[in-house]
Structures are given as C-alpha cells and as structure tokens.
C-alpha cells in the first residue's frame, strides 16, 4: 500500500544559529550521554520544526593545538536529557598566519538534513585534554518548516 503525503512541509525561512563552546579538561568516556557536561545550546527548533542543512565546528581559540572530539547532542526535554547524535574528530592544529584551521562538518546537507521536531534542542560539546574558554564556534544552517496550507 502506498502512503501519500497530502500535507507537504516546506522550508519557509533560512536561518543560522551559532554558539561558542569551551573545551573541558578530560571529559570522561562515561560523560557522553544523558547528562554530559560542558555543553552549550546551539539551536532550539521553532514551532513547526526545522531541517538542519549544515552544521560545522571551527577552532577559534589559538591556545588549543591538540586534537579533540566535537559532539552534537539532541534533547527532547529542554536539556534535561541529551542523546549524542554525532561526533567528529578535529585534527591537531598549530596557529600560523599562513594557514587556517579546518572547519569540521557534521555531514548534514539539503538532500540529507537533520530534521528536528518543535522545541527539540541541539547542544554542542568539545572533548579535549586542555581546558580553553570559547575554543570552538559551532554553526547550524537550517530552514524553519511550515506545513503547506
């Protein structure tokens, strides 16, 4: 049986959300789910939900030169419980005027977006061996979803 979508949903408004995240010293492997520490709120989905089409993290603090892990969490209860959605590795980088730090892409695209329901929240976290304040900037590009009237 074929199920037809009689109420298509379209992206109405393109938006961007951003946050800076500090790296916490030695976040334990057991601190990766449910109630992780050192997270920062990146995005709260609007009333109609949204489709995240790009999500990146970029090193912005020159005092963090070690490799680290960038984590993305989803919360459906206003941040009480967070589930890790995805992690990307950030390679070690030494600041120099002739090079730029890499932008780490979480892999969401317009053809393969991360769909969020109304009020879902995305949180970002950096796991590194060195504590650095505001070490990474996370950016989410998304489209607010509105049902076709």
What residue ranges belong to the model's regions?
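Beta-rich globular "head" domains
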Residues: 35-76, 83-86, 133-147
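Short, charge-rich binding segments
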Residues: 62, 112-116, 131
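General helical structural elements
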Residues: 19, 24, 58, 87-88
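Terminal beta-strand-rich extracellular "head" domains
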Residues: 67-112
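C-terminal interaction-tip segments
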Residues: 1-40, 44-47, 117-121, 126-149
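Arginine residue identity/basic-tract feature
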Residues: 54, 83-86, 115, 121, ...
